[in-house]
Swiss-Prot record:
Active site per database record: H132 (pros-phosphohistidine intermediate)
Co-factor(s): Mg(2+)
Catalysed conversion reaction: a 2'-deoxyribonucleoside 5'-diphosphate + ATP = a 2'-deoxyribonucleoside 5'-triphosphate + ADP; a ribonucleoside 5'-diphosphate + ATP = a ribonucleoside 5'-triphosphate + ADP
Keyword Kinase: yes
Descriptive protein name: Nucleoside diphosphate kinase
EC numbers for this chain: 2.7.4.6
Keywords from the UniProt entry: ATP-binding, Cytoplasm, Kinase, Magnesium, Metal-binding, Nucleotide metabolism, Nucleotide-binding, Phosphoprotein, Transferase
Origin species: Borreliella burgdorferi (strain ATCC 35210 / DSM 4680 / CIP 102532 / B31) (Borrelia burgdorferi)
PROSITE patterns assigned to the protein according to its UniProt record, in alphabetical order: NDPK_LIKE (PS51374)
Lineage top rank: taxon: Bacteria
Amino acid sequence: MLLQKTLCIVKPDGVRRGLIGDVVSRFERVGLKMVAAKMLIVDESLAKKHYLYDDIVFRHSEAVWNSLIKFISNSPVFTFVVEGVESIEVVRKLCGATEPKLAIPGTIRGDFSYHSFKYSNEKGFSIYNVIHASANEADAMREIPIWFKDNEILNYKRDDECEHYYC
């Protein structure tokens, strides 16, 4: 069984719009288990640990990195870890395409956001796409310890766990 943990962050635009409950319920309804959660105001140092300069600049640009740091810094976010069978892929599917205009209806981004990269770049701000989710297992393993200590990640059983994990 490929049981994984992955990091999710309801970004400032999602928090300001009151979407935390809507986002979390999408994951819980499919059987993913929340094993850690916290709401906090992100300082610039934490933002820079999460959004690695070299990675973002290589894939996008320095302007995109700067806008990400500015967007998430000094703003409230709700960050959480979910666990489940192949949870990284499941979470990415439920989130939808990173660029909201490409996200299909029924996904978090498809239902709650609509901006495009072009519009965001022209305006000089980060894309408002409600949620961050680890892209792959390596990212999840790097990101989770940035946001959570080991003792903040819980191990418990949901009542319906055997329905999802074939106990």
